[in-house]
A protein has these predicted regions:
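Active-site core of metal-dependent hydrolases
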Residues: 148-267
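Active-site gating loops and adjacent loop-to-helix segments of metal-dependent hydrolytic enzymes
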Residues: 71-82, 123-151, 193-205, 216-227, ...
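His/Asp/Glu-enriched, well-ordered alpha-helical/loop segment
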Residues: 222-232, 248-349
């Protein structure tokens, strides 16, 4: 198939071009094809932190429900996702790994680019919406079992670097997948020790961590000094637009836009469950019963529109949803950009950034 007269996103900018592809991209600047009438042609979005949508959650959905979830992602511009679990019990976590292990993309579905374990090695004080009774100290044996059960799909683990044994855990776990620091009370020195041990990312920056302070910069300051990649929820509820712009200016191409979406995404306001905990969604804002902000009900397509409306250039917003996350999970050789030989995961967007 060929698409012509598109504004193609390559090398961080848009250029008028055409593309020929089947499962993979075969050529650019070809003759003929479907006229895109100047629409934007961008790589498919990659969401490395999403728990679920349309009633399904990675922590408890059945294997036969994953395709429906993957279909929702694709319908909202996400062509690759990391199946993200919560802090749940070991048996439930093992079952989640088995459920995703056998998933294979079919038709109009997103690809599972890997698994993101959000916990269970997190701080009790900064657990956010993670269930307290399932929090554990770092356990390499458990980590290795989950990696094996996932069929080698483990790409990220979120953990708190201040826990007993965390530095040694990070040193070993980072040989298997990316270690992201989050849900943590860590001060600057402790966070830096985590990065020096091998951590490379920070999970949903500003949320579930100590704030940036001029006398104690905490994880946020450590992430900046370490050159770490940082996730950011851009639903307009978790982070103020001015702070999103500040993160963009500070971290540049290290910023990764995520949804942190829950099973309520794509559904109406109401009462839902989050890994065994009741949550309430009102005006799109998901909270525990005590008012603690949980994940989001958003998606990356909406968040693209959000950040562009906040003043971030479209080229850089697309980078934060494609190139940056692909590099973060060591998958840039296959996905994340439009290049000959890479997967033909592409989106056509109109001037209002709607899917065409």
């Amino acid at each position: 198939m060929k698409i012509s007269n598109a504004r193609v996103y390559r090398n961080g900018r848009f250029e008028r071009s055409s593309v020929e592809f089947s499962d993979k991209i075969s050529a650019f600047d070809v003759e003929g094809g479907v006229d895109a009438h100047g629409a934007y042609l961008v790589p498919g979005f990659i969401d490395i932190h999403t728990h679920g949508a349309i009633g399904y959650d990675a922590s408890d959905c059945r294997a036969d429900e994953v395709p429906a979830l993957a279909g929702y992602y694709a319908a909202h511009g996400v062509t690759s996702f990391c199946f993200t679990t919560m802090t749940i019990g070991e048996d439930a976590l093992a079952q989640a790994m088995r459920n995703i292990r056998g998933y294979e993309r079919q038709g109009a579905q997103a690809k599972c680019a890997g698994v993101h374990l959000e916990g269970p090695f997190v701080s009790y004080k900064k657990r956010g919406a993670q269930k307290a009774e399932n929090i554990r100290m770092p356990d390499l044996d458990l980590f290795y079992r989950m990696s094996e059960l996932s069929g080698g799909k483990l790409k990220i683990i979120t953990m708190a670097p201040e826990l007993d044994g965390a530095v040694e855990f990070i040193r070993e776990a980072s040989k298997v997948c990316a270690v992201s620091l989050g849900h943590t009370t860590a001060d600057y020195a402790t966070a830096m020790a985590g990065f020096e041990a091998g951590a490379t990312q920070a999970t949903h920056l500003f949320n579930a961590m100590q704030p940036l302070h001029h006398r104690e910069p905490g994880l946020i300051g450590a992430a900046l000094m370490a050159g770490a990649e940082v996730e950011l929820i851009c639903d307009g509820l978790h982070i103020h637009p001015a702070v999103i712009n500040a993160v963009y200016r500070m971290f540049g191409k290290k910023m990764i836009i995520i949804s942190d979406s829950l099973r309520c995404a794509g559904l109406c306001d109401g009462n839902y469950d989050l890994a065994g905990q009741p949550i309430v969604v009102k005006n799109g804002r998901a909270t525990l019963l005590d008012g603690t902000l949980a994940g989001s009900s958003s998606n990356l397509l909406q968040e693209l529109k959000n950040v562009v409306s906040y003043g971030i250039p479209l080229e850089d917003a697309v980078y934060a949803m494609t190139v940056a996350p692909a590099k973060a999970i060591n998958s840039f050789g296959e996905i994340g950009s439009l290049e000959v030989g890479k997967c033909a995961d592409m989106l056509l967007l109109d001037e209002e950034l709607n899917l065409k």
